[in-house]
């Protein structure tokens, strides 16, 4: 069944929408997201998958996949570039905030939110880096060494989406019809759906190279250097510059092959609220993030601060003891409260007056290797602002920077002296109807050329023990480094 009908699509066109999502449903019980992703990679290497598991045991309603982006928006050191589906530069500019450029692209793609359709029916998929902050805070100098060379922003525009409905075992093929000539646009959408169906049923799977680590992981800071950095941060806390700062450490290794199998293992061993794989022009990313940066749905904003960490116990009894220890740790509770307040302040920048509130306060969130204290903050988006404004207000999250945020970012720039890039930024989507869902870019492996990186951080407060914070970075990175190491053996186990 095709929805909407042509006559219904014409009505949406009359309402001023530039695009209308057209959907076709089919059974998905003999198709898996991973097998389909392999077919999409055979068609076009620039593709993505977005998945979700709630409470480590319940799959989210939808899994989204896309391939062959129509446009690619990138920003590097203030230079904004728009490329078409063939990689040809069609526009390049500088001297403006990236959000202006992004809005300019999206203004021709406004679409309706149709009842009963998946939450994402087309839009931008990709990332905003941690360093995106510099475009909003003009006085902030982020001049750390850039050893990785990743974009500040990389957003691919997809007007075709494949959605798994994990509740109804349905596959939903979505193509967006342009309304400039709605009859012609509708027929093209039907043709796009036909081609997607053919690819799903009869397409060949890509021969994807397995990951092979050629070296062991090398840290940016060894234990001694990281501990010195913590002591310097504590000095700034004693001097009154900041209350808290998040200091990260990076692991780097040489590798051959793809992160595809690493993603397969991550989704199995570390099921998380945000699981994603995407392959762009200059970056390949596999991740399983526990934490929302900001979510905008029909004008309602949410952010979910996670702060306070313990490793998981080997037994249920040990796990509960570690939970009690965490909830009784004054240092961890103080850190969490600071970051809840920062989340409220961030949402307050873009929310209607009086609408910001803490919905859920201090509950334990468990993941494969660690547990965290989590809270939920919500607000109502101001009518004169949009989802991109929300990213601008919240990024980077306080849980990846510190408090006060701007001074903490200055200290991170000084002490780490290494551009964070995608780590600590935002990964997710902005859809054509104005909604947004982004997670914090943590628990990720990301690759450029023959180098793969894993980064993690620890929140530093006045009574932090440097060696403990170094160990916390290791604990947080372990789910990803284990997945990278063990994914080298998947093919042999499946033979």
Question: Where are the regions that the model predicts?
Answer:
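Extended alpha-helical targeting/anchoring segments
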Residues: 1-495
């Amino acid at each position: 069944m095709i929805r909407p009908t042509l006559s219904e699509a014409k009505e949406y066109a009359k309402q001023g929408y530039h695009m209308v999502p057209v959907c076709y449903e089919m059974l998905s019980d003999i198709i898996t997201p991973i097998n389909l992703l392999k077919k999409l990679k055979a068609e076009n290497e620039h593709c993505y998958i977005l998945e979700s598991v709630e409470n480590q045991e319940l799959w989210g309603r939808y899994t989204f996949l896309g391939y062959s982006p129509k446009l690619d928006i990138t920003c590097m050191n203030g230079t904004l570039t728009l490329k078409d589906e063939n990689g040809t530069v069609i526009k390049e500019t500088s001297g403006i905030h990236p959000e202006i450029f992004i809005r300019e692209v999206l203004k021709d793609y406004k679409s309706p939110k149709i009842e009963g359709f998946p939450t994402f029916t087309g839009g931008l998929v990709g990332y905003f880096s941690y360093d995106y902050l510099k475009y909003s805070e003009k006085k902030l100098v982020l001049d750390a060494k850039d050893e990785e060379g990743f974009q500040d922003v990389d957003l691919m525009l997809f007007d075709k989406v494949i959605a798994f409905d994990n509740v109804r075992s349905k596959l939903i093929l979505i193509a967006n019809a342009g309304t400039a000539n709605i009859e012609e646009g509708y027929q093209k959408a039907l043709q796009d759906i036909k081609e997607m169906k053919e690819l799903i049923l009869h397409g060949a799977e890509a021969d994807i190279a397995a990951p092979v680590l050629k070296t062991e992981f090398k840290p940016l800071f060894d234990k001694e250097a990281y501990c010195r950095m913590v002591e310097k941060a504590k000095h700034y806390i004693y001097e009154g510059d900041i209350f808290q700062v998040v200091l990260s450490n990076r692991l780097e290794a040489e590798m051959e092959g793809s992160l595809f199998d690493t993603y397969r293992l991550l989704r199995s061993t570390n099921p998380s609220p945000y699981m994603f794989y995407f392959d762009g022009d200059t970056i390949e990313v596999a991740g399983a993030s526990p934490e929302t940066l900001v979510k905008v749905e029909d004008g309602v904003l949410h952010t979910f601060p996670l702060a306070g960490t313990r490793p998981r116990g080997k037994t249920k009894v040990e796990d509960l003891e570690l939970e009690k220890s965490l909830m009784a740790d004054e240092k961890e509770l103080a850190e969490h409260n600071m970051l809840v307040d920062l989340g409220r302040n961030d949402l307050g920048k873009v929310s209607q007056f009086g609408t910001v509130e803490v919905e859920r306060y201090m509950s334990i969130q468990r993941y494969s290797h660690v547990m965290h204290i989590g809270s939920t903050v919500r607000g109502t988006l101001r009518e004169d602002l949009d989802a991109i404004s929300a990213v601008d207000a919240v990024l980077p999250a306080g849980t990846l920077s510190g408090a006060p945020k701007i001074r903490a970012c200055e200290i991170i720039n000084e002490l780490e002296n290494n551009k964070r890039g995608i780590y600590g930024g935002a990964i997710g989507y902005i859809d054509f109807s104005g909604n947004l869902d982004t997670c914090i870019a943590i628990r990720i492996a990301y690759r450029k050329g023959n180098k793969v990186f894993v980064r993690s951080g620890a929140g530093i407060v006045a009574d932090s023990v440097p060696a403990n914070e170094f160990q916390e970075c290791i604990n947080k990175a372990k789910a990803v480094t284990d997945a990278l190491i063990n994914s080298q053996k998947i093919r042999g186990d499946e033979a």
